Protein backbone atom coordinates (compact mmCIF):
# COMPACT_ATOMS: atom_id res chain seq x y z
CA UNK A 1 0.00 0.00 0.00
CA UNK A 2 0.98 3.60 -0.58
CA UNK A 3 0.57 5.60 2.61
CA UNK A 4 -0.79 9.14 2.63
CA UNK A 5 0.62 10.18 6.00
CA UNK A 6 -1.08 13.57 6.04
CA UNK A 7 -4.58 12.16 5.53
CA UNK A 8 -4.01 8.76 7.11
CA UNK A 9 -5.17 6.73 4.11
CA UNK A 10 -3.87 3.62 2.33
CA UNK A 11 -3.97 2.86 -1.41
CA UNK A 12 -3.15 -0.61 -2.67
CA UNK A 13 -0.13 -0.68 -4.98
CA UNK A 14 0.90 -4.29 -5.56
CA UNK A 15 1.12 -7.74 -4.01
CA UNK A 16 3.55 -10.64 -3.96
CA UNK A 17 2.72 -14.26 -3.24
CA UNK A 18 4.01 -15.74 0.02
CA UNK A 19 2.72 -18.91 1.68
CA UNK A 20 1.33 -17.99 5.11
CA UNK A 21 3.04 -14.63 5.56
CA UNK A 22 2.17 -14.38 9.25
CA UNK A 23 4.77 -11.76 10.22
CA UNK A 24 7.21 -9.28 8.67
CA UNK A 25 10.21 -7.16 9.61
CA UNK A 26 12.11 -4.40 7.80
CA UNK A 27 15.90 -4.66 7.69
CA UNK A 28 17.88 -2.18 9.78
CA UNK A 29 19.23 -0.42 6.68
CA UNK A 30 15.68 -0.02 5.37
CA UNK A 31 16.40 -1.77 2.08
CA UNK A 32 14.80 -5.18 2.56
CA UNK A 33 11.65 -6.82 3.88
CA UNK A 34 11.70 -10.17 5.68
CA UNK A 35 8.62 -12.39 5.81
CA UNK A 36 7.60 -15.62 7.48
CA UNK A 37 6.56 -18.34 5.03
CA UNK A 38 5.67 -22.01 5.36
CA UNK A 39 9.15 -23.12 4.33
CA UNK A 40 10.99 -20.73 6.67
CA UNK A 41 11.82 -17.08 5.99
CA UNK A 42 11.95 -15.08 2.74
CA UNK A 43 13.54 -11.70 1.97
CA UNK A 44 12.41 -9.16 -0.64
CA UNK A 45 13.74 -5.95 -2.15
CA UNK A 46 11.63 -3.04 -3.38
CA UNK A 47 12.08 -1.31 -6.73
CA UNK A 48 11.49 2.38 -7.43
CA UNK A 49 7.83 1.66 -8.23
CA UNK A 50 7.27 -0.02 -4.89
CA UNK A 51 7.00 -3.53 -6.31
CA UNK A 52 8.62 -6.40 -4.40
CA UNK A 53 10.92 -9.10 -5.78
CA UNK A 54 12.21 -12.11 -3.87
CA UNK A 55 15.95 -12.27 -3.16
CA UNK A 56 16.09 -15.68 -1.49
CA UNK A 57 14.65 -17.77 1.31
CA UNK A 58 15.96 -20.15 3.97
CA UNK A 59 14.59 -23.15 5.81
CA UNK A 60 14.65 -22.72 9.60
CA UNK A 61 14.71 -26.44 10.42
CA UNK A 62 11.46 -26.19 12.33
CA UNK A 63 7.78 -25.46 12.01
CA UNK A 64 6.51 -22.19 10.52
CA UNK A 65 7.48 -19.15 12.59
CA UNK A 66 5.19 -16.43 13.89
CA UNK A 67 7.40 -13.40 14.65
CA UNK A 68 10.51 -11.73 13.19
CA UNK A 69 12.95 -9.11 14.44
CA UNK A 70 16.51 -8.03 13.68
CA UNK A 71 19.41 -7.24 15.96
CA UNK A 72 20.45 -3.62 16.45
CA UNK A 73 23.34 -3.96 13.97
CA UNK A 74 21.25 -5.72 11.34
CA UNK A 75 23.50 -8.78 11.19
CA UNK A 76 20.99 -11.34 12.45
CA UNK A 77 17.34 -12.17 11.89
CA UNK A 78 15.51 -13.66 14.86
CA UNK A 79 12.55 -16.03 14.38
CA UNK A 80 9.99 -17.05 17.00
CA UNK A 81 8.31 -20.44 16.65
CA UNK A 82 4.87 -20.64 18.23
CA UNK A 83 4.05 -24.14 17.04
CA UNK A 84 7.31 -25.86 18.06
CA UNK A 85 8.60 -23.52 20.81
CA UNK A 86 11.79 -22.72 18.92
CA UNK A 87 14.03 -19.64 18.78
CA UNK A 88 16.06 -19.43 15.56
CA UNK A 89 18.87 -17.06 14.57
CA UNK A 90 19.67 -16.52 10.87
CA UNK A 91 22.73 -14.74 9.45
CA UNK A 92 21.96 -11.83 7.10
CA UNK A 93 24.19 -10.36 4.37
CA UNK A 94 24.74 -6.76 3.28
CA UNK A 95 23.36 -7.51 -0.19
CA UNK A 96 20.07 -8.58 1.40
CA UNK A 97 20.51 -12.33 1.16
CA UNK A 98 19.59 -14.53 4.07
CA UNK A 99 22.49 -16.74 5.09
CA UNK A 100 22.94 -19.86 7.15
CA UNK A 101 21.31 -20.62 10.48
CA UNK A 102 23.49 -19.44 13.36
CA UNK A 103 21.66 -21.40 16.04
CA UNK A 104 18.29 -22.72 17.11
CA UNK A 105 17.00 -23.52 20.60
CA UNK A 106 13.83 -25.40 21.52
CA UNK A 107 12.16 -24.30 24.75
CA UNK A 108 11.23 -26.96 27.28
CA UNK A 109 8.91 -26.95 30.26
CA UNK A 110 5.27 -27.34 31.17
CA UNK A 111 2.69 -24.61 30.82
CA UNK A 112 -0.46 -24.10 32.87
CA UNK A 113 -3.10 -23.71 30.15
CA UNK A 114 -4.75 -26.83 28.75
CA UNK A 115 -5.83 -25.05 25.57
CA UNK A 116 -2.14 -24.47 24.81
CA UNK A 117 -1.40 -28.19 25.38
CA UNK A 118 0.83 -27.24 28.35
CA UNK A 119 3.68 -26.75 25.85
CA UNK A 120 6.15 -23.97 25.01
CA UNK A 121 4.91 -21.48 22.40
CA UNK A 122 7.44 -18.75 21.56
CA UNK A 123 5.31 -15.81 20.44
CA UNK A 124 7.85 -12.97 20.18
CA UNK A 125 11.63 -12.51 19.95
CA UNK A 126 13.21 -9.09 20.35
CA UNK A 127 16.71 -7.89 21.22
CA UNK A 128 17.31 -5.51 24.10
CA UNK A 129 18.11 -1.97 22.87
CA UNK A 130 21.73 -2.29 24.03
CA UNK A 131 22.01 -5.37 21.77
CA UNK A 132 23.36 -7.44 24.66
CA UNK A 133 20.50 -9.92 24.95
CA UNK A 134 17.65 -11.55 23.06
CA UNK A 135 14.26 -11.79 24.80
CA UNK A 136 12.09 -14.76 23.81
CA UNK A 137 8.50 -14.40 25.03
CA UNK A 138 6.97 -17.83 25.65
CA UNK A 139 3.19 -17.73 25.70
CA UNK A 140 2.87 -21.41 26.59
CA UNK A 141 5.01 -21.63 29.74
CA UNK A 142 4.51 -18.04 31.01
CA UNK A 143 8.16 -17.06 30.76
CA UNK A 144 10.47 -14.64 28.98
CA UNK A 145 13.76 -16.42 28.39
CA UNK A 146 16.74 -14.13 27.98
CA UNK A 147 19.67 -15.21 25.85
CA UNK A 148 23.13 -13.88 25.12
CA UNK A 149 23.99 -14.14 21.43
CA UNK A 150 27.54 -15.51 21.53
CA UNK A 151 28.93 -14.36 18.19
CA UNK A 152 32.25 -16.16 18.67
CA UNK A 153 30.67 -19.57 19.28
CA UNK A 154 27.57 -18.91 17.14
CA UNK A 155 25.38 -19.97 20.04
CA UNK A 156 22.41 -18.75 22.04
CA UNK A 157 23.28 -18.88 25.75
CA UNK A 158 20.47 -18.73 28.31
CA UNK A 159 21.40 -16.17 30.97
CA UNK A 160 18.13 -15.51 32.81
CA UNK A 161 14.40 -16.23 32.90
CA UNK A 162 11.70 -13.67 33.66
CA UNK A 163 8.94 -15.76 35.21
CA UNK A 164 5.44 -14.39 34.72
CA UNK A 165 2.23 -15.22 36.62
CA UNK A 166 0.66 -18.59 35.82
CA UNK A 167 -1.92 -18.51 33.04
CA UNK A 168 -0.99 -14.91 32.16
CA UNK A 169 0.10 -15.71 28.59
CA UNK A 170 2.90 -13.21 27.81
CA UNK A 171 2.61 -12.30 24.12
CA UNK A 172 4.76 -9.31 23.09
CA UNK A 173 7.67 -7.33 24.54
CA UNK A 174 8.59 -3.80 23.45
CA UNK A 175 11.28 -1.44 24.70
CA UNK A 176 11.28 2.34 24.93
CA UNK A 177 13.68 4.04 22.51
CA UNK A 178 15.93 5.19 25.36
CA UNK A 179 16.34 1.54 26.38
CA UNK A 180 15.31 2.15 29.99
CA UNK A 181 11.88 0.50 30.02
CA UNK A 182 10.24 -2.68 28.74
CA UNK A 183 6.54 -3.33 28.26
CA UNK A 184 5.08 -6.84 28.08
CA UNK A 185 1.55 -7.52 26.83
CA UNK A 186 -0.22 -10.49 28.44
CA UNK A 187 -2.78 -12.21 26.22
CA UNK A 188 -4.67 -14.23 28.83
CA UNK A 189 -4.65 -11.90 31.84
CA UNK A 190 -5.32 -8.90 29.55
CA UNK A 191 -2.74 -6.60 31.09
CA UNK A 192 0.46 -4.71 30.38
CA UNK A 193 3.40 -4.92 32.74
CA UNK A 194 6.00 -2.15 32.74
CA UNK A 195 9.59 -2.86 33.79
CA UNK A 196 12.73 -0.87 34.34
CA UNK A 197 15.50 -2.44 32.28
CA UNK A 198 19.20 -2.35 33.17
CA UNK A 199 21.72 -4.28 31.11
CA UNK A 200 24.86 -2.90 32.74
CA UNK A 201 25.42 -5.84 35.11
CA UNK A 202 26.53 -9.40 34.54
CA UNK A 203 22.91 -10.41 34.01
CA UNK A 204 20.04 -8.25 32.75
CA UNK A 205 17.75 -6.71 35.36
CA UNK A 206 13.99 -6.28 34.86
CA UNK A 207 12.27 -4.46 37.73
CA UNK A 208 8.46 -4.52 37.67
CA UNK A 209 7.11 -1.00 38.21
CA UNK A 210 3.47 -1.21 37.06
CA UNK A 211 0.66 -3.54 36.02
CA UNK A 212 -2.29 -2.07 34.14
CA UNK A 213 -5.28 -3.70 32.42
CA UNK A 214 -5.66 -3.52 28.65
CA UNK A 215 -9.42 -3.08 28.99
CA UNK A 216 -11.40 -0.47 30.89
CA UNK A 217 -14.10 -3.02 31.71
CA UNK A 218 -14.43 -4.43 35.22
CA UNK A 219 -14.18 -8.08 34.16
CA UNK A 220 -10.77 -7.81 32.49
CA UNK A 221 -10.16 -11.55 32.86
CA UNK A 222 -13.11 -12.46 30.61
CA UNK A 223 -11.94 -15.60 28.81
CA UNK A 224 -13.51 -14.33 25.59
CA UNK A 225 -11.00 -11.47 25.48
CA UNK A 226 -7.35 -11.70 24.45
CA UNK A 227 -4.85 -8.85 24.45
CA UNK A 228 -3.39 -9.01 20.96
CA UNK A 229 -1.34 -6.02 19.74
CA UNK A 230 1.11 -3.55 21.27
CA UNK A 231 2.68 -0.47 19.69
CA UNK A 232 4.66 2.52 20.94
CA UNK A 233 4.14 5.90 19.32
CA UNK A 234 7.14 7.10 17.35
CA UNK A 235 7.71 9.98 19.79
CA UNK A 236 7.60 7.56 22.74
CA UNK A 237 4.92 9.53 24.56
CA UNK A 238 2.03 7.10 24.09
CA UNK A 239 1.50 3.36 24.02
CA UNK A 240 -1.36 1.61 22.22
CA UNK A 241 -2.73 -1.91 22.62
CA UNK A 242 -5.60 -3.92 21.18
CA UNK A 243 -7.87 -6.45 22.85
CA UNK A 244 -9.57 -9.08 20.71
CA UNK A 245 -12.98 -10.35 21.78
CA UNK A 246 -14.25 -6.98 22.89
CA UNK A 247 -12.37 -5.63 19.80
CA UNK A 248 -11.03 -2.40 21.24
CA UNK A 249 -7.92 -0.25 21.14
CA UNK A 250 -6.57 1.46 24.26
CA UNK A 251 -4.23 4.43 24.44
CA UNK A 252 -1.96 5.13 27.41
CA UNK A 253 0.08 8.24 28.05
CA UNK A 254 3.66 7.27 28.90
CA UNK A 255 5.79 9.21 31.38
CA UNK A 256 9.20 9.26 29.70
CA UNK A 257 11.02 9.74 33.00
CA UNK A 258 9.33 7.03 35.07
CA UNK A 259 8.00 4.75 32.32
CA UNK A 260 4.56 4.69 33.98
CA UNK A 261 1.36 4.45 31.94
CA UNK A 262 -1.92 6.36 32.33
CA UNK A 263 -5.01 5.20 30.43
CA UNK A 264 -6.54 7.82 28.14
CA UNK A 265 -9.18 5.80 26.32
CA UNK A 266 -10.47 2.35 25.36
CA UNK A 267 -12.60 2.48 22.19
CA UNK A 268 -14.08 0.08 19.57
CA UNK A 269 -12.15 -0.41 16.34
CA UNK A 270 -14.93 -1.33 13.84
CA UNK A 271 -13.31 -4.70 13.15
CA UNK A 272 -12.93 -8.18 14.63
CA UNK A 273 -9.81 -9.67 16.25
CA UNK A 274 -7.32 -6.80 15.87
CA UNK A 275 -4.07 -8.77 15.61
CA UNK A 276 -1.71 -5.87 14.96
CA UNK A 277 -1.60 -2.09 14.95
CA UNK A 278 0.83 0.59 13.88
CA UNK A 279 1.15 4.37 14.09
CA UNK A 280 1.98 6.29 10.93
CA UNK A 281 5.23 8.32 11.14
CA UNK A 282 3.41 11.49 12.25
CA UNK A 283 1.75 9.63 15.17
CA UNK A 284 -1.55 11.23 14.14
CA UNK A 285 -2.99 8.17 12.45
CA UNK A 286 -3.46 4.56 13.52
CA UNK A 287 -3.85 1.46 11.32
CA UNK A 288 -5.26 -1.82 12.62
CA UNK A 289 -5.19 -5.31 11.07
CA UNK A 290 -8.49 -7.05 11.89
CA UNK A 291 -7.91 -10.75 11.30
CA UNK A 292 -11.43 -12.13 11.76
CA UNK A 293 -13.28 -9.42 9.81
CA UNK A 294 -10.71 -9.44 6.95
CA UNK A 295 -10.14 -5.68 7.10
CA UNK A 296 -7.70 -2.88 7.74
CA UNK A 297 -9.15 0.12 9.54
CA UNK A 298 -7.50 3.53 9.81
CA UNK A 299 -8.15 6.22 12.40
CA UNK A 300 -7.10 9.76 13.19
CA UNK A 301 -5.95 10.09 16.81
CA UNK A 302 -7.10 13.20 18.68
CA UNK A 303 -4.74 13.44 21.65
CA UNK A 304 -6.52 16.45 23.16
CA UNK A 305 -10.01 14.93 23.19
CA UNK A 306 -8.70 11.37 23.76
CA UNK A 307 -10.70 9.88 20.90
CA UNK A 308 -10.09 8.24 17.53
CA UNK A 309 -12.04 9.06 14.36
CA UNK A 310 -12.31 6.49 11.57
CA UNK A 311 -10.91 7.48 8.16
CA UNK A 312 -13.28 6.13 5.51
CA UNK A 313 -14.49 2.57 5.03
CA UNK A 314 -12.57 -0.54 6.13
CA UNK A 315 -10.15 -1.91 3.53
CA UNK A 316 -10.82 -5.52 2.53
CA UNK A 317 -7.90 -7.94 2.88
CA UNK A 318 -7.86 -11.65 3.70
CA UNK A 319 -6.97 -12.50 7.32
CA UNK A 320 -4.35 -9.78 7.99
CA UNK A 321 -1.81 -10.62 10.69
CA UNK A 322 0.87 -7.95 10.60
CA UNK A 323 1.41 -4.35 9.45
CA UNK A 324 4.78 -2.69 8.86
CA UNK A 325 5.54 0.87 7.74
CA UNK A 326 8.44 0.82 5.26
CA UNK A 327 9.68 4.38 4.58
CA UNK A 328 10.91 5.24 1.10
CA UNK A 329 14.55 6.43 1.30
CA UNK A 330 15.16 10.06 0.48
CA UNK A 331 17.04 10.56 -2.78
What residues fall within each predicted segment?
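Beta-rich, blade/repeat-based domains predominating
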Residues: 18-28, 61-72, 108-129, 164-179, ...
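Asp-box/WD-like beta-propeller blade repeats and closely related beta-sheet repeat scaffolds
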Residues: 53-124
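Blade-loop segments of beta-propeller domains
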Residues: 12-74
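Short loop/turn segments immediately following the C-termini of beta-strands
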Residues: 38, 82, 92, 139-140, ...
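A short beta-strand motif characteristic of beta-propeller blades
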Residues: 11-17, 53-59, 109-115, 157-163, ...
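Blade-level signature of beta-propeller repeat domains, shared across WD40, Kelch, NHL, RCC1
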Residues: 291-300, 309-331
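Short loop/turn segments immediately following beta-strands, especially the blade-tip
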Residues: 2-8, 44-51, 89-99, 147-155, ...
Amino acid sequence: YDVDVENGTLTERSSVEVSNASHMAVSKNGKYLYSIEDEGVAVFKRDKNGDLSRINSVNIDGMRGCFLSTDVDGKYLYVAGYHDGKVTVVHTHKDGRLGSLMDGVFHTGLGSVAERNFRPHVNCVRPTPDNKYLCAVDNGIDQVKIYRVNKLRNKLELVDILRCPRESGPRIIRFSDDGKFAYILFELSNEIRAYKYDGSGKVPAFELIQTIETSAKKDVHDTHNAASGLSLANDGKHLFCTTAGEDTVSMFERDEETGMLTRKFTLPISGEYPKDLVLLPDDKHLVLANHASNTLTTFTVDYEKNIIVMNGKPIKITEPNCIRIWPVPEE
